[in-house]
Amino acid sequence: MTGFSVSLFVSNLSNVASYLSPIFENIPSTKVVPAQIEKVVSLVSRTGRDLQRYDHAGYRQVVGCVPYRYKKQEVNGVETQVIQVLLVSAQKGKGMLFPKGGWETDESMEEAALRETIEEAGVTGELEEKLGKWQYKSKRHSIIHDGYMFALLVSQEFERWPEAEMRQRRWVSLDEAREVCQNWWMREALEAFINLKCLADDDESGN
């Protein structure tokens, strides 16, 4: 490249920089790209079992929620509130169940419960009482699990969530949940939830 060509190239580059400088100055200094990336990451489920938590006996630790809401309903002209619970379809096989998954070593039990509920059911809210602990054996792997369940009062329901393409979710009555929930230990967790909430409602009503 001749000296004249180099000089012309540098001159043109300088002109381009001078032209673009005011444009860049007018661009807001907010961190747009990280915010967009964060939204994408939030739609991805954790995979693998490298961080999976096991107890001293080698039992896999699993945690989940009974997500619920109060729904207004009119009966004989009287408006009341009834409890509905949220079920999700099984990822493999048929049936409906409550959201649950592995409790990992880098999170608390409560954090795991909220994370799994967002990943599988696309809802979040206020985590309430622990409903109990159940031991069950996995049908696929014949591994014993310790399953913990919490009540979760739903405050936010997302249109898009990590497992939306793999699962369906459905709000159902307590009676329907008793019929369609496929796991025996989750049905027991549901009964614990019903006993807890019915007693609380009775106390509030003075009965």
Curated annotation (Swiss-Prot):
Which Gene Ontology terms of cellular component type are present? cytosol
| One family name in Pfam for this protein | NUDIX
The cofactors it requires, by name, are: Mg(2+); Mn(2+)
Listed under GO biological process in this entry are: cellular response to hypoxia
| GO MF | ADP-ribose diphosphatase activity; metal ion binding; NAD+ diphosphatase activity; NADH pyrophosphatase activity
Q: Which keywords describe this protein according to UniProt?
A: Hydrolase, Magnesium, Manganese, Metal-binding, NAD
EC supergroup of this enzyme: hydrolase
Q: Which domain of life is it from?
A: Eukaryota
Q: What is its EC number?
A: 3.6.1.-, 3.6.1.13, 3.6.1.22
Gene3D superfamilies with a match to the protein in the record: Nucleoside Triphosphate Pyrophosphohydrolase (3.90.79.10)
Q: Where is the Nudix hydrolase domain?
A: 58-194
Its protein name is: Nudix hydrolase 4
Please tell me the species this chain comes from: Arabidopsis thaliana (Mouse-ear cress)
User: Which gene codes for it?
Assistant: NUDT4
